[in-house]
Amino acid sequence: MTDLAARLAANADDIADTLVSLLPRAEIDGVRCAEARLLDAMHYGSEGGKRLRAFLAVETATVFGTDRGHALRVGAALECIHAYSLVHDDLPSMDDDALRRGRPTTHIAFDEATAILAGDALQTMAFTILASDATHENPFIRCELVTCLARASGARGMVGGQMIDIEAEKADSPLSLTEISRLQRMKTGALIEVSCSMGAILGQASAESRRAVEYYARDFGLAFQIRDDLLDAIGDVAAVGKAVAKDADAGKATFVDLLGIDGPIARKLITGCSWG
């Protein structure tokens, strides 16, 4: 295992522990509460994964000398948003996926209505975490964290990107490279970019440092999506942990369609993602 892989795994364990401590529990004094099924689904939908967004936030915050406990809370909030997006993305009305992270998706493991509510609750949980003074003693920093995450995950970010993706499936012609780049910057890249940005905010980084972090994260987000498209095109279910070839079956335009398996633009983006 490389040093990076080891750090990613260690951070994933820390984030998992943080989420367990922050998400509401289904039992109160040993008795399951009336909404226990919802709470079980919240925990289920937020389990597993690489915790990449949390890792980016924690590592960026560490660069700027932030308390790790504060950074882990920000990472947990990001993972709540990411988990909610996956739970909803897997629904029959969206991608209709039955497998996520190597096990049944939340609406399969529970039911569709519970999955919708679990996603809703995970979304609001993210902002509950960020608004707490346990995340940072400075209310202005907490407010900026909330604002940045709301913007990145909303209509001009992740959710807007999902809408463009849905509309693209019904379009008469495939998206251009410019259009698909914008789609993916919103749908996938916005949350990756804000992960780094929130780490810098937590560390009270200078404006210049924040810009540098955001430029890095922007291209990293596109490179990450290119990798995801490659896995969908040439990966296998056992390795990826979810259904593959779904994009091609749905007629979606991807970076692989436009650039090929070894496109030069993809290589440029991937090799350009460095702190230097």
Language-model features: where?
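N-terminal amphipathic/basic leader segments beginning at the initiator methionine
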Residues: 1-26
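Mg2+-dependent prenyl diphosphate-binding active-site environment of isoprenoid biosynthetic enzymes
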Residues: 20, 28-276
